[in-house]
A protein has these predicted regions:
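Cytosolic regulatory regions built on CNB/CRP/Popeye-like sensor folds
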Residues: 1-155
Length: 155
């Protein structure tokens, strides 16, 4: 059974994350109050492509490998989500199923907020919308940079 409490190191990783630490104390409190802990061993499946968006997730320890599997069966790693990073919010907004597989990389602890709690937090903390928009903007800028590099760097 999962230990329902974050360790001191895991809590510090969440609290010191660039995005999360920028939120108001009351919003951070409400997010953490609703969250629950899940622990995984190296290589465990956390979420599969096609899964419903049941949770908003933060990595607290280890890493989450986000990947896609080609028709040929080749698995392509898209990114590693490190401690302090939140993810899965896009599916929470649009309600579509998960678009990629996610696996634990090393012993991994994640913090999860159920979809219903996510919606309640959004309703009581309008600032979360703006904060998530800033997070998405940062992700889009990073993506544009990667696309630019792919198109301009020599092979």
């Amino acid at each position: 059974m999962d230990d329902p409490i974050l360790t001191i190191e895991e809590r510090e990783a969440i609290n010191s994350g660039r995005w999360f630490s920028s939120l108001s104390p009351s919003l951070r409190h409400d997010i953490l109050r609703c969250a629950f802990v899940k622990r995984f061993k190296d290589g465990d499946l956390i979420a599969a492509r096609g899964d419903p968006p049941d949770h908003w997730i933060a990595c607290a320890k280890g890493a989450v490998r986000v990947s896609s599997t080609a028709v040929s069966g080749k698995q392509v790693t898209l990114t590693y989500v490190e401690p302090g990073i939140w993810f899965g919010d896009v599916a929470m907004f649009d309600g579509d199923r998960r678009t990629h597989d996610s696996y634990s990389h090393g012993d991994t602890t994640i913090l999860c907020v159920a979809r219903a709690d996510f919606q309640k937090i959004l309703a009581s903390h309008v600032e979360l919308y703006e904060a998530l928009m800033r997070l998405q903007a940062r992700r889009i800028r990073t993506l544009f940079g990667l696309v630019e590099d792919l198109n301009t760097l020599p092979l």
